């Protein structure tokens, strides 16, 4: 390697080519370059853009013999860019519930970052 020979005169005299070794990376360096850790870091960054939408529904279903009330909680975790798709799916499910059940009352709570909205 000619470039090593050209730079050899700049090295301190106590270091020779035969004793020069590449140090092993420290655990901190390995942590940075680990593929799974990089993926986890990306997921943490994505987590800041997630909206947690909690649909709390109370379904009152009447039949000839009994009147029963059942509460359901459904948690949608959607990316902010796809919040419209999640709401469209919810509206379709809600309309299907209205078709087959007498009455559906629901509460929507949106958790996004530090804010909390309820409708």
UniProtKB/Swiss-Prot annotation:
The chain crosses the membrane at residues 74-94. Keywords: Membrane, Transmembrane, Transmembrane helix. GO terms for cellular component: membrane. Residues 1-20 are annotated as: Disordered. It is found in: Membrane. It is a single-pass membrane protein. This is Putative uncharacterized protein YJL152W. The lineage of its organism: Eukaryota, Fungi, Dikarya, Ascomycota, Saccharomycotina.
């Amino acid at each position: 390697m000619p470039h090593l020979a050209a730079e050899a005169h700049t090295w301190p005299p106590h270091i020779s080519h035969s004793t020069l070794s590449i140090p092993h990376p420290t655990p901190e360096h390995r942590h940075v370059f680990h593929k799974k850790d990089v993926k986890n870091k990306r997921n943490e960054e994505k987590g800041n853009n997630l909206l947690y939408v909690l649909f709390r529904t109370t379904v009152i279903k009447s039949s000839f013999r009994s009147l029963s009330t059942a509460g359901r909680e459904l948690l949608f975790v959607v990316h902010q860019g796809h919040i419209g798709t999640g709401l469209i799916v919810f509206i379709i499910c809600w309309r299907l519930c209205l078709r087959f059940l007498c009455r559906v009352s629901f509460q929507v709570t949106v958790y996004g970052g530090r804010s909390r909205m309820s409708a």
